[in-house]
Amino acid sequence: MKNVPYLTTRKKTSNHMQLNILITGSNGQLGNEMRKILKGNDSFNTFYTDIEELDISNRNVVEEFIITNKIDYIINCAAYTAVDLAEDNIEIARTINHMAVENLGIAAHKAKAKVIHVSTDYVFDGTSCHPYSEEDSTNPQSVYGTTKLDGEKVLAKIIPNDHIIIRTAWLYSIYGKNFVKTMLNLGKTKDCLNVVTDQIGTPTYAGDLANAIYQIISSEKWIPGIYHFTNEGVCSWYDFTKTIHKIAGITNCIVQPISTEEYPSKAKRPAYSVLNKSKIKQIYGIKIPYWVDSLEKCINELNQDLK
């Protein structure tokens, strides 16, 4: 592990002390969006870490880092998200999605820090006929969903008043590998694509999720518990793909709807995973963009990067 420089002093900005923020998994989609939104913000002194800088599966290292650096907020963007691979790599998924979260919780408890932890719609079985609320029963159908739920539970047990869990779904951005970038590439290189039409949910632009997290840590209120966040609206993966191609101006690729049965995968996916976001909107006053608007913003940003 590389030595990350430890803090010696806190700066005072205006009438407030600078808050020390630790972001884990900072090289991923959400981590990169957090970098973008916090850049140049003097209210926060932010440590951006990934496994090379901070191995969150190592409890002693985590505790030393968080306590020594007087961390106020931990934003855990780290996760094992390879849903199908998790079925064959149970221990790796458990280590990152459960045990590492426990390590962060224990360290946060000792340092009196607060934790914002990102979770998933996969904690639900997908059999609902209405958008899932935070109080609805969980019933994960995959190793990924099970390990993420275990991470939620252990964090809430260790720091009941100092945790916020944000469940999200269908995350995409200009960074890393994700569905939007894959469909853009396939749309430009394939004549025909088959995409599942009977799995229903809502895409989430990582930039919008990062903004929601920023609003929470900037707020003077802290209401612990579970929250749901995706963009507004509902679609299938087929609808999502058609809209991606429409916005990008891809016209020479035929997108055909197929059923989940026609596209078998190792891990079971929720057939319906629309999340009810009323709680986060009411408590923190967060305005959530419609999914098509955010998708257009992301694709425009990708196009700018290509120029």
For the regions a language model picked out, list residue spans one by one:
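Mid/C-terminal beta-alpha module of Rossmann-like enzyme folds, strongest
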Residues: Q29, S219-K266, K307
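Adenosine-cofactor binding site in Rossmann-like domains, unifying the SAM/SAH pocket
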Residues: N45-V62
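NAD(P)-dependent short-chain dehydrogenase/reductase
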Residues: K153-G201, G207-D208, Y214
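Conserved C-terminal active-site "lid" loop/helix of NAD(P)H-dependent oxidoreductases
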Residues: S236-K242, S259-C298, L302-K307
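Substrate-binding strand-loop-helix patch
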Residues: I174, Q199-A210, F229-I247, K297
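NAD(P)H-binding glycine-rich loop region in Rossmannoid oxidoreductase-like domains
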Residues: R59-I96, H109
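N-terminal Rossmann NAD(P)H-binding glycine-rich loop of SDR-like oxidoreductase domains
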Residues: I21-I37
